[in-house]
Amino acid sequence: MLSIKNLKASIEDGTQILKGINLEVKPGEVHAIMGPNGSGKSTLSKVIAGHPAYTVNEGSVTLDGKDLLSMEICDRANSGLFISTQYPTEIPGVNNVEFLQMALNSKRAYLGLEPLADADFKKLCEEKMAMLEMDDRYRDRGVNDGFSGGEKKRNEILQMAILDPKISFLDETDSGLDIDALRIVAHGINQIMSPEKAVILVTHYQRLLDYIKPTYVHVLRHGKIILSGGPELALKLEEQGYDWIEEN
């Protein structure tokens, strides 16, 4: 599914942030990426998404064999990539549900499918909103406009549920969530998952992984994945921090 090989990327002044990332994600897997602040976790998601502030210096990223790095940003999304950001953007004046319908039909057009009928989209949206315990107030508001931090995170998972991506890269989805909101968001992610899909979770905390069980846990430090393991690795990091890890 997603293959990242020797990915190196820098910012405008030439400072290299990613220094050789290697990661293989297969269908049905959940990968958790943990690491100290400034280790390159958010940069990795932005580079995969095609953020213009970053330059890829070396390496490759493919999704189902397709070269993501050569694609326009919209084509990456339409090909099955979903990125949830640490700080979701507010778009005042753009209706939340209309935005979702437009995004979904854009993806369907890219895949050669007819637009989803209004009645069918309404039903789909209502089902996914109910799954995330979102009330009708979300329907008529601007995209993330005036939303609390927790509401923005929940709205991102609604977008993920509607767009039905092959692989989702969720950057600190648990940030700013209380226990109840965390439970709801995690339930939504688990409901969306299937044997054909995959998720990459960036998190600092074990508490998210109590709800969403990772297949693998990776430690990212100084722009490299320096250690990988199973769910037990996250528990050890929770107990001991990162200082015990030696770079190989």
Where are these regions (language model features)?
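Conserved structural motif at the start of ABC-family nucleotide-binding domains
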Residues: 2-4, 17-20
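Conserved beta-strand-loop-alpha-helix hinge in the C-terminal portion
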Residues: 211, 220, 224-247
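The feature captures the beta-strand-to-loop junction immediately N-terminal to the Walker
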Residues: 34-36
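ABC ATPase NBD Q-loop/coupling interface
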Residues: 60-76, 144
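ABC ATPase C-loop
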Residues: 160-161
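Q-loop/switch helix immediately C-terminal to the Walker
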Residues: 83-87, 93-109, 121-124
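Walker B catalytic motif
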Residues: 169-173, 180
